[in-house]
Amino acid sequence: MRRTTSRSLPRTVTLSALVISATLALLATSTATATASTAQPLNGLFRVASGSYFRMIYPGGGKYFKNPYSADTNKTYTLIVAGTGGGLRTGVLQPAPTPAFGPHGNSLAGRIIRPADFAGIDFGLATKGTAPAISVSGGRLSGQVKGFTAEWNNLSFSQGGPVTGSYNALTHIYVLSWSSLISGGPFNGFTGSWHLTGTFVP
């Protein structure tokens, strides 16, 4: 019987394959590292301008709560304007004042936004515990606003979470969005949807 033997690849071919494989792995690692290193933190003020709003989604999704006191023709949008601090600051906290509420449960937290009428009671915004942190990479924003809190009717609602958005380095115009589940109070189980836009000031 004829004996068959397996034929091995020439040593030079094997070495070439190993070199190519190692080079590709190195390039992939370098690319990932470069991408991560290009993310730059934006520490400063995200000014709140026209076009910023809050919406509230019913449990289960698909339907938005109508705020009869909204200044917009579409009552599912509650328009928000800058407060005394100009907007949302990263790297520092913007706590609610003491006391945090006035008569009838109206919020006195007016640094981030001017308290807005929601269902007959003014709500304000504050940041507590963890300062907001937002970075930009390739014109895309990412980060967190874990300490973002809505103050309304003598209650504080955590509305923090991861954020996404866009940023133009030439005009400094940004768009920032996120959503957060509401726990407790009369709107327990609803989801708050936030949309901020304006300019960033370092």
Show the residue positions of the predicted features.
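Sterically constrained small-residue positions within well-ordered secondary structures
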Residues: 25-27, 134, 167, 187-189
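Secretory targeting and sorting signals
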Residues: 2-36
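Predominantly extracellular/secreted and cell-surface proteins with exposed
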Residues: 62-167
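Polybasic, proline/glycine-rich intrinsically disordered low-complexity segments
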Residues: 169-183
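Alpha-helical protein-protein interaction elements
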Residues: 16-18, 38, 45, 93, ...
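A short, surface-exposed beta-strand/turn
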Residues: 156-173, 193-202
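Short, hydrophobic/proline-enriched secondary-structure or compact coil segments at domain edges
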Residues: 44-50, 138-150, 177-179
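N-terminal segment immediately downstream of the Sec signal-peptide cleavage site
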Residues: 35-88, 180-202
